[in-house]
Every structure is written in C-alpha cells, then in structure tokens.
C-alpha cells in the first residue's frame, strides 16, 4: 500500500533544552530522537495511506510555525533551519496537488520544501 509522509524538520545547535523548547513552542509531539545523542534536529511527521484524503500539510505546518517565528528565532532557529519534506510512495502513477494558498504562504515564508517520489512496485519484485 502506498504511503505519503509530510515532514517538518527543524535544525539547531545540539541541545536537549532547545529540543524541548521547540516541542513546547509548537505544541505537537515530534518523532523520537536517538536518546544516546544530544538532539540537533526536531522532526515532526504526518503519515497517511494513499487512499486517505490528501492532507494540506503546507498550511498545517505554516499554521504551527507562523505564530511562533519570533520565539523560534530567540532559540537561534531561523527560517533557513526549517525544511518541509514530502515523501510520496506510489504504484503506477505519482499524482499530488497543492493548494495555491499553501504554495503562496510557503514562498512568502522563505522555507524550503523537498519532494521525493518512490515507485514501490519495483521493490515488490526484488
């Protein structure tokens, strides 16, 4: 079954305190980090199956970030430290859509977005 992962990455100088403060500021639970290392990356993910309604992750992530840019900057986190990463596993056809308002907001925010597409049907035959 195809899956889609909408991911928010926030890079910072390694610090348990900063990791916890980012969690508190954004008010969502990040993916667990390696507890043996001091975290330098905060990572939040939305996951869905292809049959589900497409999540408007751009607007969702910006709704989390925009009211908190000043607080994040006080933690030493600038927009260049933030990345949206969309990973799309597909079978037969890669098809995705984004709202105009989301793309406009993303462009105005100065945040980078990466998109990776993987045809998982090739992995089935391996």
Language-model segments: residues:
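Acidic (Asp/Glu-rich) sequence patches and key acidic residues
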Residues: 1-126
């Amino acid at each position: 079954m195809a899956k889609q992962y909408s991911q928010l990455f926030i890079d910072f100088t390694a610090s348990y305190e900063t990791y916890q403060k980012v969690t508190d500021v954004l008010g969502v639970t990040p993916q667990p980090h390696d507890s043996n290392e001091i975290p330098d990356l905060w990572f939040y993910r939305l996951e869905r199956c292809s049959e589900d309604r497409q999540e408007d992750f751009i607007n969702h992530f910006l709704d989390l970030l925009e009211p908190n840019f000043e607080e994040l900057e006080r933690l030493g986190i600038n927009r260049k430290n933030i990345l949206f990463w969309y990973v799309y596993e597909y079978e037969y056809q890669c098809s995705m859509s984004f709202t105009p308002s989301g793309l406009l907001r993303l462009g105005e925010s100065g945040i980078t977005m990466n998109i990776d597409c993987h045809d998982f049907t090739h992995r089935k035959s391996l």
